[in-house]
């Protein structure tokens, strides 16, 4: 019924907000534990040779990895995922070096607020 539709909508809005939050946080050079550690000297040299920025560290080279982050929701849950298996593997490697894929405490509070506010509109 309407509660199920409202729950799906609330989960969808929360998931969409978290997708943007991860992308914005990463673009600012921040992971789950604060500021990313710097690139290695060799990688800085490589990035410079390709005309890429070297600071802040933001996991952005071609843009494909972050662009492949999407979300889906149903009446029971929402999830964020990578639409490309190659980009998912790349994300796992970057996450191992500089944890970024997940939800910070602050982001969790935002998700809770969005979900509750959306659900309260119909209850």
Give the residues covered by each predicted segment.
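Short, Lys/Arg-rich flexible segments
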Residues: 1-123
